[in-house]
C-alpha cells in the first residue's frame, strides 16, 4: 500500500484531519501539505477559481520526496501522500473513498458540518487509509468506534467510607456491601459476620471510665462520616481494656482484664476504619462472656488480615512506576534491512539486485536498476589520437605493399612466353603475400581448396597484348581485395559518435592480430615450376608488416550504445 497519509486541508492552509501510517510522521505530512499549497499557488493565482474542472484532481511531486494526490472540493483539499516514485494513478481510489466519507457527513462539504462529527470522520478516514471503506463507521455508535475510556477512579480513596457499618461492629448477621476502591469491588468474606451477643455486653456496669475506654454500643453508622483513618485494632490496643488508675474495680473486672486483653500485634492493617469517639467500653463482668469475646477477637483478626492482603496488593500496584515510553510512540521507527517497498530479488549482469536480509548494507528501491555513466566526448582523447596514428602508419605500409605487389607481377609476366600464361600473376602475388599457393604446379596445391576454385587459371593461348594486361590487372585487384579482407580485423573502425553510454571494461586475452596472423601459412619456395622460382626471389624483399603487440593488461572499452 503506497498511500502513507491522508490530509483534509482548507484552501487557506488550515488542516482539519491528518491521518498517517507508521511510515510517515505527522511533521512530514504537515510539511508536504504546506508545500502542496505553496506549489499550486505558484502555478496560478486563480488555480481554485478556474472555470474548467480538469485541474480538480491530479498529482504533484513536492519536496522532491513525496507525491501528493489532490482533489479540490468546495472548501477543502483532499490530499493523499505517497512516495515520489510511485504510480501516479495509485491514489485515486483513496481520494474517492475520502470524498465519499465527507459527502455522507456534509453534502456541501462545509467545514462547520464536518466538525460536528469530527470523531466519526476521523475514524472513517483512518479506515480509508488502511484500505477499507470508511462510510460504515458513520452509522455506528461512538462507543463502538472510539476506544473505551478507562473508568474514573477516585484518587482520594482514604476519605471514601462505606455508608453502612460492617457487621463486626453492629453485630448484624448480614454481609456488608462491597467497597469500591481503585475501581475494583472488594467483597468481604461471609465468615466476618459475628453473633449478636457481642452487642449485648453489660452496659449497666458502674465501672466506666469516660477517658480511657470505648463503648462499642455507642459506635453507630455516624462515625463513618469522619475523615481521620484509624484502625480498630490500634484503638483496642491503645485501651488494652486495662484501667490501672481505677481503684473501684472488683474481682471480676480484674479477672476480665488479665485474661481478655487484646494483643493484635500480628495484624498490620491498612483498612479504612472509623475513628474513635468519646464513649465508654464496658468491662465484661461475667466469665461466660469470655468465650464470646475470644470468638469476636479471632473473627476480627481474620477480617483484618483479609482486608490487609487485598489493600496491600492494590497499594503495591498504585505505587509502581510505569515508564512513559509505554504510552508514547518513538519518533523514528527502527530501520530493517528489507523495507516494505523493496522489489523482489532479481539477477542481472551476474549479480543479485537486492541484498539479503542478513547483509549489513540495506537495500533500496533502485537496486535492480542499471546505473549508467555518461562519458564525455573528450574522455578518451589521447587514446583516440594514438589509434589514429597507428591506423595511418598501417595504411601507409599497406600502400607500399600494394605497389610492390604490382611491380612483382609485371616482372614475372615479362620473363615468360607471350603466348601462354599459367597463373604467373597468382604465383607472384602468393610469394609476396605469404598466402597458400594456388598454382597447380606447386607441391602444396590442393584442388579442393576454396582459393583454387575462386581463382580461374586459363591455359588457352592469348595473342592480344591488351587482353594479357587486363587479366594481370584483374588478378592483382583480386589479391588486393583478399589482402584487405585478411587484415580487416587488425584495424577496427568505430563509427563517429557524439557520446556513448559505457559500462565496465574487459581484458584482451588474445588479440585479433595474433590470431589472424597465426593461421597464415608460409609459401612453398621449393616449387618445381620455374615460373614460381623465378618470382620468389624478387618478392622476398616485400614482406608483410609485423603485427602490433598487445599485452594482456591492455583494456578495451565495451561500447554497447552508440549515438
From Swiss-Prot:
Protein name stated in the entry: TSET complex member tstC
Phylogenetic classification of the source organism: Eukaryota, Amoebozoa, Evosea, Eumycetozoa, Dictyostelia
Organism of provenance: Dictyostelium discoideum (Social amoeba)
Compositionally biased tracts (Basic and acidic residues): 379-395
Classification via InterPro entries: Longin-like_dom_sf
Biased composition (Low complexity): 428-459, 474-487, 507-543
Gene transcribed to yield this protein: tstC
Polar residues: compositionally biased ranges: 460-473, 552-563
Region (Disordered): 146-170, 192-213, 235-298, 376-395, 428-563
Assembly: Component of the TSET complex, a heterohexamer composed of tstA, tstB, tstC, tstD, tstE and tstF, which may act in plasma membrane turnover. tstA, tstB, tstC and tstD are likely to be the core complex members with tstE and tstF acting as associated scaffold proteins.
